[in-house]
Curated annotation (Swiss-Prot):
Belongs to the IPGA1 family. Microtubule-associated protein probably involved in the regulation of microtubule organization. The keyword Cytoplasm applies. It comes from the Eukaryota. The gene is IPGAL2. Residues 221-236, 256-272 have a biased composition (Pro residues). Residues 104-180, 392-448 form a coiled coil. Residues 1-15 have a biased composition (Low complexity). It is found in: Cytoplasm, Cytoskeleton. SUPFAM superfamilies: Formin homology 2 domain (FH2 domain). This is INCREASED PETAL GROWTH ANISOTROPY 1-like protein 2. Signal peptide: none annotated. It comes from Arabidopsis thaliana (Mouse-ear cress). GO terms for molecular function: microtubule binding.
Length: 558
């Protein structure tokens, strides 16, 4: 009982459990004398022989049994009543578990709400990010449009500056030409005034001459009558008196008659009057000479001025016309950009989306596209303002042009027919030129195939015609047919040369035929049986001393 009282400070629920498990699991407790329960240890001392000690041991055993019964009785009662103790102390635990479940549910609901809010926020964030991206794309598009507008404005400003500079230069040229015309007119006016003065002075000179003649006739003696005297030869001028010479000149001269050339220098005059009269003769002649020179100079000057005027006018007209044409061209380009935007966008879509099954479709599409673009004022200047697929359009046009040229060559080779009326030299040269053209075209096609076939495939343009089994094969077959025509013409010419018995002509024709056959063999990779038969026929018509060498050559060709 003392052991139970010492452990009463712990709760009854725990104490009962501990006492139950301790009774079951713990070994027997020690006795008061310190001995543990269990098997007694053997000792060398025999207790049976000592009656006093034997009695004390028996008493101790009785006491320990009683104590054990006293200790185990309440423990057994507690173990029997344990479910009641558990029920008594287990009931208050139920509200604690309900509260924990409610808290768990509340925390779970709060976590769900938080999760939902997070999901809503994430959705809003995704929507906002998409809106931001769309706005950024719109901003970039607006920036590109703004840059294009700025570039177009810069180009228009440059064009306006050029036009203004051209106008300023044209005005400067016009003003300089007009300033050059003014001195010419002033010069002409001054010359006209000089001419008027000379004419007036010349009209005054006959009056002075008449007065001088009258005075000289008064001073001179009367001359004999001409009827009485025989006609005498004219005297030298230096022997004739000045008065008589003046009288005769005045009688024969009229105011409008041209003056005579000046006489040789006379001897010193005897009279001062004659000296004065002779001194008055030279100024009119010199003045007339100067007048004529001035007239000639004025004519030359007027012609040069007129020529300069015509040149200046033509230059001015050309400058003005060029400015007008340029301005009209720019206006037409601007009008096409503003009014034909839809039309050009439709063309862009067709170029990007059209698919082709063969090259015939490509040629038709390229022809149609060229006709549509021909309606623009300036194709390149207008299309650079749009997102024109220039690379694909150029590739389509390149493929169409190359295929058209090859098809034309193949048709020309296959449809060639020899005209016997044409001289054989001209006919053979024409066929050789066709073979040269075929070789050049095939080499060009091979280069184009190596450089552009990948781009053709990217743009979905047919490439079968570029292969060896396409146009190359057709052209080679046509060249073999051309070689057969060449051999037949050479054979005919050899027959005519045999009739004429010309060995040099035969040998030259043979060399030409074999050379052409060899070139065709190398180009086409062989000859057909008909061409080989024609070559054999040529070999049969060759002279005997040349037949062996040519036969070996023909064998190599076959």
């Amino acid at each position: 009982m003392s052991r139970i009282s010492t452990t009463s400070t712990t709760p009854s629920r725990v104490r009962a459990a501990n006492s139950h498990y301790s009774v079951i699991s713990k070994p027997r407790a020690q006795d008061d004398n310190g001995l543990t329960g269990g098997k007694p240890k053997s000792s060398g001392y025999d207790v049976k022989n000592d009656p006093a000690k034997r009695r004390s041991i028996l008493l101790k055993r009785a006491k320990s049994a009683e104590e054990e019964m006293a200790v185990l009785a309440p423990q057994r009662a507690r173990s029997v009543n344990r479910p009641a103790v558990v029920e008594q102390f287990g009931c208050p635990r139920r509200p604690i578990s309900r509260k924990s479940e409610e808290t768990v549910m509340a925390t779970a609901a709060a976590e769900d709400e938080k999760r939902k809010r997070m999901e809503e926020l994430e959705e809003k964030l995704v929507v906002n990010e998409s809106l931001i991206k769309d706005l950024q794309l719109q901003v970039l598009n607006l920036k590109t449009e703004l840059e294009e507008a700025r570039n177009s404005n810069v180009e228009l400003e440059l064009n306006n500056r050029k036009l203004s500079q051209d106008l300023v230069s044209a005005e400067a040229k016009i003003s300089s030409l007009s300033s050059n015309d003014k001195p010419a007119k002033e010069h002409q006016n001054s010359r006209f005034k000089d001419i008027q003065r000379l004419i007036a002075s010349k009209l005054e000179q006959p009056k002075v001459k008449k007065e001088v003649a009258v005075e000289s006739s008064r001073l001179s003696p009367p001359s004999p009558s001409p009827s009485r005297l025989p006609p005498t030869p004219p005297l030298p001028k230096f022997l004739v008196s000045p008065a008589s010479s003046l009288g005769k000149r005045d009688e024969n001269s009229s105011p409008f008659a041209p003056p005579t050339p000046p006489p040789p220098p006379p001897p010193p005059p005897p009279r001062p009057l004659a000296k004065a009269a002779r001194a008055q003769k030279s100024p009119p002649v010199s003045q007339l000479f100067q007048l004529l020179n001035k007239q000639d100079n004025s004519r030359n000057l007027s012609q040069s001025v007129n020529g300069n005027k015509s040149q200046v006018n033509s230059a001015h007209n050309s400058i003005v016309g060029e400015i007008q044409n340029r301005s009209a061209h720019l206006i037409a380009i601007k009008a096409d950009i503003e009014t034909k935007g839809e039309f050009i966008n439709d063309l862009i879509q067709k170029v990007l989306t059209t698919c082709f099954s063969d090259m015939e479709d490509v040629m038709k599409f390229v022809d149609w596209l060229d006709k549509e673009l021909a309606t623009l004022a300036d194709e390149r200047a207008v299309l650079k303002h749009f997102k024109w697929p220039e690379k694909k359009a150029d590739t389509l046009q390149e493929a169409a042009v190359e295929y058209r040229e090859l098809k034309k060559l193949e048709k020309e080779l296959s449809s060639y027919s020899d005209d016997p009326n044409i001289h054989y030299g001209v006919a053979l040269k024409k066929m050789a030129n066709l073979l040269d053209k075929s070789e050049q075209r095939i080499r060009r096609l091979v280069r184009l195939r190596g450089s552009s076939m990948r781009s053709y495939q990217d743009f979905k343009i047919p490439v079968e015609w570029m292969l060896d089994s396409g146009m190359i094969c057709k052209i080679k077959r046509a060249s073999i047919k051309l070689a057969k025509t060449y051999m037949n013409r050479v054979a005919n010419e050899l027959q005519s040369a045999r009739n004429l018995d010309r060995e040099s002509t035969k040998e030259a024709l043979l060399l030409q035929g074999v050379r052409f056959a060899y070139r065709t063999h190398q180009f086409a990779g062989g000859l057909d049986p008909e061409t080989l038969c024609a070559l054999e026929e040529i070999k049969q018509r060759v002279p005997s001393h040349l037949r062996l060498a040519r036969g070996n050559m023909a064998g190599n060709l076959s």
